């Protein structure tokens, strides 16, 4: 939130720790941003919620309106079309389907999106997605693996981690080796359900 607040024509309202924002917070910051660009936009009083799929746009809309006006789900493409909802007098909030870049040249960005569920598991092999997450956890957040799985990260790599996780969770395949797809699903489900705790897959530039 602090990083985005420093960018031009941008504001960071939510950091994942502090209390949830209100409708008045949204409108007030919108007014401030509009005054920096084009004050004629104040007449329209429309705020669009847009972003990548499965990031919580509809959840935010439901929270702000204090009722379930948008369908939510733990998968991309739940929202199919635009929806206009009254926020405050003279102000409307528009929910939109998630949007992705036509092509992601940066493969690490693609994997980070896939880990969160923004890109469907059918687009990238689930084992590859989980492998990326395991390597990131071992490098950046080894304490998460220790806390959840009692696993001490080392230089033995992701394959050793999946073997140990398979033994722990009973996802052993033929030959006594880890069933990689089943074990990958376990890791991804734990991450997506918040069982690994709160942490970022990407850090702001320094």
Predicted regions and their residues:
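Canonical P-loop GTPase G-domain recognition
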Residues: 1-51, 69, 170-171
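Glycine-rich phosphate-binding P-loop
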Residues: 47-66, 96
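Short, structured loop/turn "capping" segments at alpha-beta junctions
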Residues: 37-41, 62, 68-74, 140-145
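Helix-rich effector regions associated with P-loop NTPase G domains
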Residues: 9-19, 73-206
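Glycine-rich, phosphate-binding/catalytic loops in enzymes
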Residues: 3, 66, 109-113
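Alpha-helical scaffold segments in soluble metabolic enzymes
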Residues: 25, 29, 59, 132, ...
